[in-house]
């Protein structure tokens, strides 16, 4: 019997994500789990995507990303790590909006909420983030 794994996609863009946010997503969803052998199937199918598949600067590290935003069309859950110093590309914002409209679960870590706001996904909704990053 084959069971479909839950598809999780982490979204990156050059200078957009914090390294700790990416590490958390990788550890939670991308790392092998000891219990997977007990359950008989892996828990998640984990993918990282970006607008232009290429090396993406995350903190002081270049992350080699092989998948484009088309990966979002197959996602069950989309992860937005904490936001870095650059705004997300419009192509990513549009892809997030399409994923949301399809009913995909979208999760942000910390200041990743700003990316959701820039995509218009928080319009009229309460949201939280770190208070020390608020400027208005």
Regions found by a protein language model. Name each.
Residues 1-106, 114-119:
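Extended, subdomain-level signal for the structured scaffold at the beginning of enzyme domains
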Residues 106-107, 128:
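Structural detector of well-ordered beta-strand residues that form the stable sheet scaffold
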Residues 123-136:
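A conserved active-site-flanking secondary-structure segment within enzyme catalytic domains
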């Amino acid at each position: 019997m084959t069971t479909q794994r839950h598809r999780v996609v982490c979204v990156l863009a050059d200078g957009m994500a914090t390294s700790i946010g990416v590490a958390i997503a990788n550890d939670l969803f991308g790392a092998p789990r000891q219990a997977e052998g007990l359950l008989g199937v892996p828990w998640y199918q984990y993918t990282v995507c970006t607008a232009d598949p290429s090396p993406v600067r995350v903190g002081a590290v270049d992350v080699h990303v092989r998948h484009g935003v088309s990966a979002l069309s197959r996602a069950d859950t989309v992860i937005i790590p904490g936001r870095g110093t650059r705004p997300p590309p419009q192509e990513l914002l549009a892809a997030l909006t399409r994923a949301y409209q399809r009913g995909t679960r979208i999760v942000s870590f910390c200041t990743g909420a700003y990316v959701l706001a820039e995509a218009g996904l928080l319009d009229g909704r309460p949201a939280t983030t770190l208070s020390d990053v608020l400027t208005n």
